[in-house]
Amino acid sequence: MVKIKEVAMNIKINEIKMTPPTAFTPGQVIEEQEVISPSMLALQELQETTGAALYETMEEIGMALSGKLRENYKFTDAEKLERRQQALLRLIKQIQEDNGATLRPLTEENSDPDLQNAYQIIALAMALTAGGLSKKKKRDLQSQLDTLTAEEGWELAVFSLLELGEVDTATLSSLKRFMQQAIDNDEMPLSQWFRRVADWPDRCERVRILLRAVAFELSICIEPSEQSRLAAALVRLRRLLLFLGLEKECQREEWICQLPPNTLLPLLLDIICERWLFSDWLLDRLTAIVSSSKMFNRLLQQLDAQFMLIPDNCFNDEDQREQILETLREVKINQVLF
């Protein structure tokens, strides 16, 4: 393993992670409603969940998200390495500017070679982006970074440390498995992806880790077929993160409609995953979770507002939003319960 020379190691990575959605408490409802609308709450939560640094990472692969994949240009190994490093340095610089990042030494428990290499890569990248280095010093640090980043698979470990601060081997292994499944399995509906991450601690942060890792892979990918698979995985993960950003708003609406905890967000995802939403299907799902006709009608109103708010990228196509709203309003007009 390459030794790091003269790199400042007084860094606390766990101080730079973006704040996930906070738990909702019913006592907050009236006060929040008086200050800000439910729609604005949800929009703020979406923005908070995605974060500026992630958009910086995804900027280069915007063409892939729009379906305009790169032509089959052959990068040399040196060009691939340079692209990866430049993307890493941009991300590190952005995080430092946003949060004033520092790095804490690894504990003895973090003896995983991948994590140790990732720690050294982050420290080197931070030193290089800090500026004020002599040419010789910069050249020495760059040489060390070249050696470490020449090995494959460092990205996921780096992003895990940046986002979570402390990562163990089991967490890193589970992220590797999930990332490969996200790339390979293009048939699984979004609702099932959500159920796979539902019990994860720090699930928003972990999905962000996967997004950054897939974005990095796509940024240097040259095979058109692989570009398509990576771009599709990126879209799926981005949609999943957008829905996770609605969690706090869904908790608020669960309290308003007297629903069991953790039922509304899965319902939104199930609705989105229906190719065509039928009123009978929707009626069965809603009556299973409401306690009265009053709460049923209130839930319909909340869902109507939600689906008017949800960003376009959450839907399967440009017509789905309107079809869902039409079905919700059909149920509201025609159905009399209890």
From Swiss-Prot:
Any Gene Ontology CC annotation: outer membrane
Domain of life: Bacteria
InterPro entries listed in its UniProt record: HrpJ-like, T3SS_TyeA-rel, TyeA_sf
Keyword terms of this UniProt record: Protein transport, Transport
UniProt-listed GO biological process terms: protein transport; secretion
Record-linked NCBIfam families: PRK15345.1 (NF011872), type_III_tyeA (TIGR02511)
Identification of the protein by name: Secretion system apparatus protein SsaL
Organism: Salmonella typhimurium (strain LT2 / SGSC1412 / ATCC 700720)
Lineage: Bacteria, Pseudomonadati, Pseudomonadota, Gammaproteobacteria, Enterobacterales
